[in-house]
């Protein structure tokens, strides 16, 4: 069986949690917990509350995600 692709949504950082985790409010109003992707961590991209981001979520668990991109 083929692996299902990630779901991408845009959202806004609401709160910074510990261990590089963030609470993100998606466009549809849902709040999820997300962590920073490895490339963003490697390039020291800072994320602050209020930043607009793109989040990738697994179709199997829609309450968690990975922050893939921070909009300028």
UniProtKB/Swiss-Prot annotation:
Keywords annotated in UniProt: Cytoplasm, Initiation factor, Protein biosynthesis, RNA-binding, rRNA-binding
Residues of the S1-like domain: 1-72
Subcellular location: Cytoplasm
PROSITE patterns according to UniProt: S1_IF1_TYPE
Cellular component GO terms held in the UniProt record: cytosol
Subunit structure: Component of the 30S ribosomal translation pre-initiation complex which assembles on the 30S ribosome in the order IF-2 and IF-3, IF-1 and N-formylmethionyl-tRNA(fMet); mRNA recruitment can occur at any time during PIC assembly.
UniProt protein name: Translation initiation factor IF-1
Organism annotation: Parabacteroides distasonis (strain ATCC 8503 / DSM 20701 / CIP 104284 / JCM 5825 / NCTC 11152)
């Amino acid at each position: 069986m083929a692996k299902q692709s990630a779901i991408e949504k845009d959202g806004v950082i609401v709160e910074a949690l510990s261990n590089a985790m963030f609470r993100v409010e998606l466009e549809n109003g849902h709040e999820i917990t997300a962590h920073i992707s490895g490339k963003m961590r490697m390039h020291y991209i800072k994320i602050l509350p209020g930043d607009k981001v793109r989040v990738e979520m697994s179709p199997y668990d829609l309450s968690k995600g990975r922050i893939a991109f921070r909009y300028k």
